[in-house]
Amino acid sequence: VMADESVCTPYDAMRLAREQASHVFSLKVAKHGGLLRTRKVAAIALAADSGWYGGTRLETSIGSAASAHVFATLGGQHYNCELFGPQLLVDDIVTVRMAVRDFEPQLPDGPGLGIEIDLQQLARFARALAGSQPQHFDM
């Protein structure tokens, strides 16, 4: 059994670990609130002898590169990952998308996250430059 939406915070991970409710934790950097919180959730999973699966939130190459880097730092039982978000996008804001070979994402190895922002693409996608204003919707 893999915990996905039921494990967003380290508190959720502790609860699931105590209850032995899952054999695998789905890790998603955006879902957990960043790289460090993802590592905290992973540490709890590993301490509970659970495995982990690297998931995605259909982010750009920036998010996928960040996820790839944090997943590369984790040990323990690994149940693959899915970092296909950039492959679903028509355009992206990086000069070169993260490579995938033999169904495996290739960890970028340049400075920082190993990616380079395409400033022309960034300007193209910026709402303020396109003439529209950000809107807030109450839910």
Segments predicted by a language model, with ranges:
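Shared catalytic-loop signature of beta/alpha-barrel
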Residues: 2, 7-104, 108
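C-terminal extensions of enzymes
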Residues: 88-139
